Amino acid sequence: MTDVTIKALASEIQTSVDRLIQQFADAGIRKSADDSVTAQEKQTLLTHLNREHGSAPDKLTLQRKTRSTLNIPGTGGKSKSVQIEVRKKRTFVKRDPQEAERLAAEEQAQREAEEQARREAEEAAKREAQLKAEREAAEQAKREVADKAKREAAEKDKVSNQHTDEMTKTAQAEKIRRENEAAELKRKSEEEARRKLEEEARRVAEEARRMAEENEKNWSETSDSPEDSSDYHVTTSQHARQAEDDNDREVEGGRGRSRSSKAARPAKKGNKHAESKADREEARAAVRGGKGGKHRKGSALQQGFQKPAQAVNRDVIIGETITVGELANKMAVKGSQVIKAMMKLGAMATINQVIDQETAQLVAEEMGHKVILRRENELEEAVMSDRDTGAAAEPRAPVVTIMGHVDHGKTSLLDYIRSTKVASGEAGGITQHIGAYHVETDNGMITFLDTPGHAAFTSMRARGAQATDIVVLVVAADDGVMPQTIEAIQHAKAAQVPVVVAVNKIDKPEADPDRVKNELSQYGILPEEWGGESQFVHVSAKAGTGIDDLLDAILLQAEVLELKAVRNGMASGAVIESFLDKGRGPVATVLVREGTLHKGDIVLCGFEYGRVRAMRDELGREVLEAGPSIPVEILGLSGVPAAGDEVTVVRDEKKAREVALYRQGKFREVKLARQQKSKLENMFANMTEGEVHEVNIVLKADVQGSVEAISDSLLKLSTDEVKVKIIGSGVGGITETDATLAAASNAILVGFNVRADASARKVIEAESLDLRYYSVIYNLIDEVKAAMSGMLSPELKQQIIGLAEVRDVFKSPKFGAIAGCMVTEGTIKRHNPIRVLRDNVVIYEGELESLRRFKDDVNEVRNGMECGIGVKNYNDVRVGDMIEVFEIIEIQRSID
């Protein structure tokens, strides 16, 4: 249908253009005279008009008038003509479709009710006829008894009245005749019923024989074994017995007759499923039983299940975690029953929620089942126990961790000890991840771990303290105890590791070693000369003074500790650091604790496993083995392990893979169990939270420790208004997948000591993504803070700009009360918000409506000048009031 204009449509339907435009406007469609109208808009208008004026009338009234003339004879023989008008009125009602359906349903229900009533009436008539026949039979029996008594009386008194005797004999003969007729009718009906039953029995037997012949034919086609005859006889005898039972039930009558007739209904030709399942099973059982001997009997295979009289108590095996649905399946009950039992115990759970072993045990025992607790790490324990750990323990080198505040000279001190220049290679001179080195000294070998001092690397310092024997706490003599120094002391105490204090930068003029001792004593680190257990050594990493004394102190402390380890046997250790190398794959820095790690060993490392393909020391040289307290880089793992994971050499790579996969699944279950679910108790808290802005970040770094540290630091920046969300993180360069993820989630791409490859740069350029590279963690955190600060809503502050004192009050016909004021402070500006103060109490807050000076409207009045002030919608201004003018300024907030 083509579109027409408003004018053409108006002429077509014979109405005015203005009326048609108004009708379209009422229907919600704005049109002008030259606009075109689509078919959809026409339909909308038609629907609106039908709704306004109503569609076709529901009632139709027809009126008919019939006029005729009637001649009425009048007086004097004259006829009088009378006009007669007959008016007929008939109303037709158009029913609503729902009403029509309802009436049709009512008519159908009425017809069904009438049919039901008719059937009930017929049944009542049948019952009445049967009762009437029974009553007649009873009366007949009574009459027979009475007649017998009369006959006996008549025989005793034969001579009394011959005529009476003859009448009695005639009545008796009539009664005998009626009795004979009733007996004949009863005999005929019984013969008819017996004949029908016999025909039915013959038909059932014939059907049974026919089915037996078909079964014999089927069995003969599939097998030529002598069991066919057995099948034939068993099937035939079975159906014969069935026919006999049916016949007996029909003869007995009652409900059994109707049921047996239904059961004996003939099966369709060719329907192999017409036989009952019990018959076929018994026939097959008899055939199988015929192999053993001739006299083996076939027993009917019937369902032997009976509903248990009491609850079945089961042995429920429960692992460390289990979902509510799995627990319900193990107890063979519905999940709702388990949830109900948990609610009785005071715990709310959904059917897919993971519950711990103790809760599952309580629920199962509450429901009456026996619980068997299963340790799911049996395979892991078996793999760990099947290790050759050696026997003889030998002295080993101490593992020393250098800890302290940032920029206190930890790396410089270690540089001097190693006689290499490493700090210049660190970005900004700050250690970004753990470095592990072993140093040969004149008095023996020492392994050093250099940890970062920045606040973000708390977890890395904690790992360093756990993997170490001695902590060297570096404190700058000119700076004293700082926050990370205190944190290092706490880590050392938590790991129960002895502390050797190196007071660094002793060569500076402002150095104050005694101040360091006093401050450290407040945290439980007392020098030996004060009766404590900690050695204090004054060193200068720049000048090299005191370095030998520090090494001697470390070796002395190690000698006191009597450090020993098994050198021969399968190695075990810890991951100090890990990262993903583009050419070599996952690389892990491992500190061997016991045994000897060889090239080619199969290692299990947290969620990862693999064969050691290559080993390198801290200088990048290839080595074939590493003993206790030796840090090495290993290649060949299946993935990047988490820093701090245990490294264990095992015998079987297949079992190592199984254990690693089990650990991954276990970690996932624990993570799901810890997830915060949106339950009823925190629903209102979620509802009350306002709009929260999010800063999405995709983070890539060079090593795993840096990823963890940066993620923790960024997540700690989150506030109630702005939250940091790490969409994705990983080790290695920025790939195309990372760029696509950032584009899909509107995230910032952050690279820490890594770069984007060519394909990623194309996606970043095409999507105009925000890509930022960092090499110092300070800069990264500061820029994310700045981005978050931009998302914070500004803070509104009221700043008073002027104060005026009311000296007099005038009346104005236009503005009402006008306050004649003297500006005492600042500037009074027009259209600014004001407050009216009376006795230093705010009584009104509004805005200036009029500001005049000598009858001239002005925009502002300065200090020391008089003016007239009209306050909008306020006339209760009195002499002595103060009018305070202020302005609202926005202050940009920042993340602290």
UniProtKB/Swiss-Prot annotation:
Ranges for domain tr-type G: 395-564
Protein name: Translation initiation factor IF-2
Cytoplasm listed as a keyword: yes
UniProt subcellular location: Cytoplasm
Function (record text): One of the essential components for the initiation of protein synthesis. Protects formylmethionyl-tRNA from spontaneous hydrolysis and promotes its binding to the 30S ribosomal subunits. Also involved in the hydrolysis of GTP during the formation of the 70S ribosomal complex.
TM spans (from-to): none
Gene3D superfamilies on file: P-loop containing nucleotide triphosphate hydrolases, Putative DNA-binding domain, N-terminal subdomain of bacterial translation initiation factor IF2, Translation factors, Translation initiation factor IF- 2, domain 3
Region (G1): 404-411
Gene: infB
Keyword Protein biosynthesis on entry: yes
Entries under PANTHER family matching the protein: TR-TYPE G DOMAIN-CONTAINING PROTEIN, TRANSLATION INITIATION FACTOR IF-2-RELATED
Region (Disordered): 93-307
Region annotation (G2) ranges: 429-433
CDD domains xref list: IF2_eIF5B (cd01887), IF2_mtIF2_II (cd03702), mtIF2_IVc (cd03692)
Keywords assigned: Cytoplasm, GTP-binding, Initiation factor, Nucleotide-binding, Protein biosynthesis
UniProt feature, compositional bias: Basic residues: 256-271
GO terms assigned for molecular function: GTP binding; GTPase activity; guanosine tetraphosphate binding; translation initiation factor activity
Basic and acidic residues: compositionally biased ranges: 93-219, 272-285
Cellular component GO terms, alphabetical: cytosol
Family to which the UniProt record says this protein belongs: Belongs to the TRAFAC class translation factor GTPase superfamily. Classic translation factor GTPase family. IF-2 subfamily.
Pfam families: EF-G_D2, GTP_EFTU, GTP_EFTU_D2, IF-2, IF2_assoc, IF2_N
